[in-house]
Amino acid sequence: MNQQLPRFIRPLLAAALVSSGLAAEAQGSGTPAPLSLQIINHGPASFHVNSVLVSGAREAILLDAGFTRADALRVAAAVLDSGKKLSTIYVSAADPDYYFGLEVLHAEFPEARIVAAAPTLKKLAAALPTKLQVWGPRLGANAPRQPVLPEALAGNSLSLEGQTLEIRGLDDSLAHRSYVWIPSIKAVVGGVNVFGNLHAWTADTQTPAERAAWLAKLDGIAALQPAVVVPGHMLPGTPQDLTAVNHTRAYLQRFEAELPKAADAAALIATMKAAYPQAGLGIALEIGAKVNKGEMKW
């Protein structure tokens, strides 16, 4: 025990002691540790959807649960690796790629409360039977077996170790599509409102008024002047800043302009592919074009 440490170890140990000392000092002074974000970016089969783990010194909140059982297991692994206690799972949207993973996560973390804003929960619960009918056979063993529903969130914020996560976007015609603003780190987790380097999913916004409300949400995000923006869906390597907000806004404006000009969905698809040749998630364009040209029901 009294053997001298190798020289290369000494600076590392000293740095670790200083770091732990500073952390203890901050904790002792009542200053909360800065929150951190970990993005779990699910693959193309899950529409490139993101789950985001927001961590404090001891506890964490998960934003969105993933689409498949496999997605949720990867999220669970990230939570376990973090060493933090998962206090809350928040579901920001009523789409199945945001909540199908809840069953697995509830089994792994039964003490974590699972919540969604009331408009999200209302739409989610109403659509659940149809979503299971559509996606259950497609996902097979990766589908939920006994779906878990969130509870309605009281108020419009979450708290993590004394720091607030504000739930925004609840006061418009797309109130079921929220986003999260974390003022202490000037970060937005954009949910289904923000797409990074992808075709935006327009099948669920079938009127000009709904798409205008979507654009207004993007303006609301930009007005916060966030330092960090995590898209709800993104290709790997997408910058976590306002780039994705600007991309989504420009995409919707172009879609709105081209929609009445296109003779049919095929023409609209061709035009948007030419305008965004590098964008992923082609299925979003294909379904969105067919739905908005009246060639498909959604």
PLM segments and residue spans:
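Active-site HxH/HxHxD metal-binding segment of metal-dependent hydrolases
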Residues: 81-159
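Boundary of Sec targeting at the N-terminus
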Residues: 27-29
